[in-house]
């Protein structure tokens, strides 16, 4: 089985996800993705015709953040038209899913060069874009809701911790154990390099 390697990683700056308030909120989501894809191409002297696929993730795949965001961002970045793209929506797990799928494609031998990433502009999420319409993972499907009631991540995390017997002290201990790793990562520059945005 082939090995899969992460060669580089890049991200845009974070900002407030409110139009009129956030520094990046007025930008098109495809432009955010294109900025990252262009940086990866330039930093690695990448011939984009060699890219087999671009697997992109998003949450709330609608409006300007809808469609095949990965493919459109690649075209906006000037990638060769041979570089295909696919976009998936697995809510907050979209980014890690794209990396897993990219590795699987490479390890299976189906593809050689895959770029994985994602874009989420909070100004497009239902709760922020239209506060009168609360976000529902079941999209208003009452039959599904009756069979499988769903809740948000914070409530789910609290319920799981309660069921598994993880109390606040244990959560705090995990935080204290993981913080030195985070500090070490920052100081040794193992963190993802950010890409400035032209606003």
Residues covered by each model-derived region:
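Conserved "HGTGT" condensation-loop signature of ketosynthase/thiolase-family condensing enzymes
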Residues: 1-83, 121-199
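Active-site-proximal alpha-helical scaffold in enzymes
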Residues: 88-120, 161-182
């Amino acid at each position: 089985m082939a090995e899969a390697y992460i060669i580089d990683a890049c991200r845009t700056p974070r900002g407030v996800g409110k139009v009129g308030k956030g520094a990046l909120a007025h930008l098109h989501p495809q432009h955010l993705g294109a900025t990252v894809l262009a940086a990866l191409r330039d930093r690695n002297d990448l011939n984009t015709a060699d890219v087999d696929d671009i697997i992109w993730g998003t949450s709330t795949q609608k409006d300007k953040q809808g469609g095949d965001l990965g493919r459109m961002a690649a075209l906006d970045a000037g990638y060769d038209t041979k570089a295909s793209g696919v976009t998936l929506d697995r809510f907050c797990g979209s980014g890690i899913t794209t990396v897993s799928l990219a590795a699987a494609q490479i390890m299976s031998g189906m593809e050689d060069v895959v770029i994985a990433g994602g874009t989420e502009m909070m100004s497009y999420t239902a709760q922020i874009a239209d506060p009168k319409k609360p976000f529902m993972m079941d999209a208003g499907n009452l039959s599904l809701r009756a069979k499988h009631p769903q809740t948000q991540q914070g409530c789910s995390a609290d319920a799981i911790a309660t069921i598994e017997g993880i109390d606040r002290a244990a959560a705090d201990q995990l935080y204290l154990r993981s913080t030195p790793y985070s500090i070490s990562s920052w100081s040794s520059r193992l963190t993802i390099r950010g890409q400035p945005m032209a606003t």
